[in-house]
Amino acid sequence: MDKRKSMWEMYLEHGMSRRSFIKGCVALTSLMGLSSNAVSKVVEAAEVKQLPVVIWLHGHECTGCDESFIRSAAPLASDLVLSQIALEYSHLLSAASGEPFEAHLHETVEKYRGQYILAIEGAVSTKDNGVYCMSGGRPFTHTMQEVAEGAKAIIAYGSCATSGGIQAASPNPTGSAGINPFIGSIPCVNVPGCPPIPEVMTGVVMHIALFGTLPPLDGEGRPKQFFGNRVHDTCYRRPFFDAGMFAENFDDAGSRAGWCLYKLGCRGPETYSSCGNLRWYEGMSYPIQSGAPCIGCTNANFWDNVPFTERLPAYGKFGNADKIGIAVGALATTGVVAHAVGSVMQKQKRDKAEAEKKQSLKEHE
């Protein structure tokens, strides 16, 4: 791609209207966690900035992150790849292969040195000179380091890239590790998850593409807008936790009624992610909503914290029946469950009122 176009020019080329372009910019602004005041800046950047060149490398992994990426709904992955970035190299998404494909990688690195965004999916294999993960006939470690040297910014997609992934589980026979110790001082944003949420992946690359800088990061190099809250804090089952109402096994009445999964091993109280906010498949669902406890897949070394159904050590203070009203307010649309909870609440109120009445009579005797 000799003459790179702007995002606006690509919209025009595809016959899309100005209205569609503005709507896309508004959606991107929201996705990136920016205020409505930033819409004009996003529009301006999308109008004039050339599409960013992106190189996507695959290390020791399962391509699950790519599979997640192509399911992004806002923006659509197809729109992103065809109209919003210039994806020059990707093992999974590119049509080319073989020696010409590898030659194109090296040509792109030289042509856009210091300008391209490098996305890395997968771990680095360190044992036996990296022979357990080969790419283009070479150890992936060598290719990754060469390409990383010329990158403007690096995105570590998935828990394999950020901390080694499943293949790093004890005893880690391949010596798999995250990429950060091998990329030098190049700015890097970590996007953990097994896999990450699709819109988190697209949101991060678009932030760098439009503003030329990494998004605000936390102490672990993760974008704050997507990893600023615990799964526990945004969970729709949280009122049950506060009320002390827990499923004891996967087929009891509590589980069927949607009670808290803490006692079944849920890692939500210690896991930072946007699962409860963004969810998956256009906001349809996420593991906890499907009845499975969070396994903490954005946490480093989560794969060794097994069994996943084992309860975490005591966390905070559970609620009591007096707090059940909180659950009622949050679960007003859950039909039978809300009715059952409301009944308990009313009984508690009656008992409390009766106790207060008896106490008052005693004081007046």
Locations of regions flagged by a protein language model:
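N-terminal secretory signal peptides
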Residues: 1-16
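N-terminal export signals
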Residues: 20-42
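Alpha-helical transmembrane segments
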Residues: 332-346
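Cytoplasmic C-terminal tails of single-pass
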Residues: 351-365
